[in-house]
């Protein structure tokens, strides 16, 4: 794939993304095709986006062709877990020096690939370009092609230098690498009538493991996971699925639309967070396949799981009812976590629209109602203002906002990719309720909100002086 201005515009203009236009491709929004403005890569560049989209392929090696900082500063930032191979946990880099920048890094890249393949025997090697190697003009395609032929191992170039744009664009560039070099290159041993792919699910904190057993009970086979806890081979035969389940549409919508065009695989956008959304997801899958027996199994499973959940969540609902929440996250979580909190009787008073599509925003408006606040930007000052204005009891956000909550002396729950607790599916709902309850009712908040001893002493001293003066 040649990374040209036209290709970037194509990735930024997706027919399935209602922020660009509706699903029929009408009403194109030209602003979506503009190149990245200075500063747009803050908080995650295109290289970072491509790597976090592809690194969860667990039996592949991931080689960063660039300076040591590109690999070191971003490695393992997303807590995607594996049920098998741990190759993806090892970071590989060509560690370019000044001499390599001057004379070119292609020879060093080839040597790095050779050493990696001989020593670790990965199922495949993904090679990531970075700002430096893109600027000096190293030919990744030629090196990867030669190495593939020599070592009979798929060596896949990923053209996502950081300067081309934001993390979201990098996600899509990672998806393009899969479409160009991986998907459709192998065939599964067999297929079933209910084969699906999960796209945009990264198994953060192992939360996908709470959802897969549900599909197994229903007789639905997850043919390929793109890319959480995935094996390289399963991504190769993902083109034989009957339905794509899009979990994070902002990130890999290009994969869903391209697979629909090339292989005729339709897609639906769903969420695994919250009882209502999980129920809706299972029902929509059954509705798509149109199988009466599957629909019956889905309804039976929903009844069983919701009955167990009602019992498990009863004490948490009683303790969390009426608590006010400010939610600051991005993408699908900006509305799906709202639904999960409302299932627990909590009131979400504000949420962010960072990285949200127009369809996401419509869902947020429906969930929050007319009084809900939608945050376009969430600087610490703005978040503190909203917390004070809404009298919020809790801030649910990413780890970088933890100190904002501490300043406001309110409880905080980490909801982003750095977290260590799974919140997806029915089991994840119980875990989320437990974490919310522990955060809100921790005794520390009663203590930190008390006046300091010296303030108490000062007040008592002033009161004593006033009495003496009288």
UniProtKB/Swiss-Prot annotation:
Residues 18-27 have a biased composition (Basic and acidic residues). PROSITE patterns: NITROGENASE_1_1, NITROGENASE_1_2. GO terms for molecular function: nitrogenase activity. The keyword Transferase does not apply. Transmembrane segments: none annotated. The keyword NAD does not apply. InterPro entries: Nase/OxRdtase_comp1, Nase_comp1_CS, NifE, NifE-like. GO terms for biological process: nitrogen fixation; protein-containing complex assembly. Pathway: Cofactor biosynthesis; Fe-Mo cofactor biosynthesis. Residues 11-35 are annotated as: Disordered. Gene3D superfamilies: Nitrogenase MoFe cofactor biosynthesis protein NifE, C-terminal, Nitrogenase molybdenum iron protein domain. Keywords: Nitrogen fixation. It comes from the Bacteria. PANTHER family: NITROGENASE IRON-MOLYBDENUM COFACTOR BIOSYNTHESIS PROTEIN NIFE (PTHR42956:SF1). Belongs to the NifD/NifK/NifE/NifN family. This protein may play a role in the biosynthesis of the prosthetic group of nitrogenase (FeMo cofactor). NCBIfam families: nifE. This is Nitrogenase iron-molybdenum cofactor biosynthesis protein NifE. It comes from Rippkaea orientalis (strain PCC 8801 / RF-1). The gene is nifE.
């Amino acid at each position: 794939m040649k990374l040209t201005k036209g290709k970037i515009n194509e990735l930024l203009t997706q027919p399935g993304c209602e922020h660009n236009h509706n699903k029929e491709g009408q009403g194109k929004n030209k602003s979506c095709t503009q190149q990245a403005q200075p500063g747009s890569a803050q908080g995650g560049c295109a290289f970072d986006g491509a790597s976090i989209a592809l690194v969860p392929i667990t039996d592949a090696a991931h080689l960063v062709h660039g300076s040591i900082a590109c690999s070191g500063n971003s490695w393992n930032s997303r807590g995607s877990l594996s049920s098998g191979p741990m190759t993806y946990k090892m970071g590989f880099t060509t560690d370019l020096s000044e001499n390599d920048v001057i004379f070119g890094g292609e020879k060093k890249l080839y040597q790095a690939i050779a050493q990696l393949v001989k020593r670790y025997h990965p199922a495949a090697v993904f090679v990531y370009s970075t700002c430096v190697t893109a600027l000096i003009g190293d030919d990744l395609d030629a090196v990867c092609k030669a190495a593939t032929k020599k070592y009979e191992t798929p060596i896949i170039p990923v053209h996502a230098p950081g300067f081309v744009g934001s993390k979201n664009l990098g996600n899509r560039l990672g998806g393009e690498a899969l479409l160009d070099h991986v998907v459709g290159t192998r065939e599964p041993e067999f297929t079933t009538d209910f084969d699906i792919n999960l796209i945009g699910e990264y198994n953060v904190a192992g939360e996908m493991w709470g959802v897969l057993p549900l599909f197994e009970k229903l007789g639905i086979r997850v043919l390929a996971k793109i890319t959480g806890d995935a094996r390289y081979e399963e991504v190769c035969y993902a083109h034989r699925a009957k339905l794509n389940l899009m979990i994070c549409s902002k990130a890999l919508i290009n994969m869903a639309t391209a697979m629909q065009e090339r292989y005729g695989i339709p897609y639906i956008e769903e969420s695994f967070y919250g009882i209502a959304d999980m129920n809706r997801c299972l029902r929509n899958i059954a509705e798509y396949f149109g199988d009466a027996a599957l629909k019956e199994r889905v309804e039976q499973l929903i009844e069983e799981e919701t009955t167990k959940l009602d019992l498990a969540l009863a004490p948490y609902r009683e303790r969390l009812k009426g608590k006010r929440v400010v939610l600051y996250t991005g993408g699908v979580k900006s509305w799906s976590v709202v639904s999960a909190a409302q299932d627990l009787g909590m009131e979400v008073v504000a949420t962010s629209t960072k990285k949200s599509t127009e369809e996401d925003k419509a869902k947020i408006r429906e969930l929050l109602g007319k009084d809900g606040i939608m945050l376009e930007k969430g600087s610490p000052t703005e978040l503190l203002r909203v917390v004070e204005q809404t009298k919020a009891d809790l801030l649910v956000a990413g780890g970088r906002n933890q100190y904002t909550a501490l300043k406001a002396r309110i409880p905080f729950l980490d909801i982003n990719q750095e977290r260590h607790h799974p919140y997806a599916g029915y089991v994840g709902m119980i875990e989320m309720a437990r974490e919310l309850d522990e955060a809100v009712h921790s005794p520390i908040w009663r203590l930190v909100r008390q006046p300091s001893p010296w303030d108490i002493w000062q007040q008592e001293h002033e009161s004593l002086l006033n009495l003496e003066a009288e």
